[in-house]
């Protein structure tokens, strides 16, 4: 079982990177997610770690998914680290503890950091590769989510992708955004009517590529 985790925190279309303090033992000054030691299945402890180093309170956070642990080299040690994905309703951060600064970045730019903790970009891919973000009008999130669920529960042309859509998440605090977990992009595109001719396109909805 993994005894450590790295959290990737998303706010709308950006992901949070934290820069380690200069005086820490491992990777001083390196860019990181939010690193913590402990059981990644203990979500209360994981959320407490986020609050500890960012100041973001639990009511502004929602867990999305975790990936398989990776063995990462920390000096002469090999640590099993589990990547985890959360969404946040706020982007105000107070970097403290292990970290000295922070930056909200486009997910595609994670790999451009010259000095980062091991496999930082790859681990983000482990938790984000099957997550797709839909942007809609503020106030219409629940209606759109219900329409998506209704499409999935039918017996028509979308029946063949029902097993490919794993979940639809509409965090109450993320105004204007819906998260869809699916096995591939083209299934989401079919679901919302962006490919093919058999599905009516959903209005006021755009797909954000992450």
Regions found by a protein language model. Give the residues of each.
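Conserved Nudix-box catalytic region and its N-terminal flanking loop in Nudix hydrolases
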Residues: 14-53
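NUDIX/MutT-family hydrolases
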Residues: 83-87, 94-126
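Short, charged/polar surface micro-motifs in flexible loops or helix N-caps
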Residues: 10-15, 23-24, 69, 89-93, ...
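Acidic-enriched and Gly/Ser
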Residues: 128-207
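Active-site segment of metal-dependent pyrophosphate-handling enzymes
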Residues: 51, 55-92
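Conserved N-terminal beta-strand and adjoining loop/helix that marks the start
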Residues: 1-17, 37-40, 83, 89
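Short beta-strand micro-motifs in enzyme catalytic cores
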Residues: 3, 77-86, 103, 130-132, ...
């Amino acid at each position: 079982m993994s005894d450590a985790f790295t959290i990737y925190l998303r706010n709308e279309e950006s992901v949070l990177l934290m820069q380690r303090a200069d005086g820490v033992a491992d990777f001083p000054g390196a860019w990181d997610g939010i690193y913590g030691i402990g059981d990644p299945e203990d979500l209360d402890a994981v959320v407490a770690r986020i609050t500890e180093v960012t100041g973001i309170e639990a009511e502004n956070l929602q867990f999305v998914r975790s990936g398989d642990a990776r063995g990462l080299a920390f000096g002469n040690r090999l640590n099993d680290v589990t990547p985890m994905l959360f969404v946040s309703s706020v982007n105000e951060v107070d970097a403290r503890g292990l970290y000295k600064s922070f930056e909200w970045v486009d997910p595609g730019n994670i790999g451009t950091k010259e000095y980062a903790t091991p496999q930082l970009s790859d681990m983000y891919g482990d938790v984000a590769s099957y997550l797709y973000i839909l942007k809609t009008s503020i106030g219409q999130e629940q209606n759109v989510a219900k329409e998506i669920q209704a499409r999935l529960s039918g017996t028509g042309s979308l029946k063949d992708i029902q097993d490919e859509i794993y979940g639809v998440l509409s965090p109450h605090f993320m105004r204007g955004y819906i998260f869809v977990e699916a096995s591939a992009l083209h299934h989401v595109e079919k679901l919302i009517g962006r490919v093919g001719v058999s599905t009516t396109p959903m209005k006021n909805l755009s797909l954000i590529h992450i």
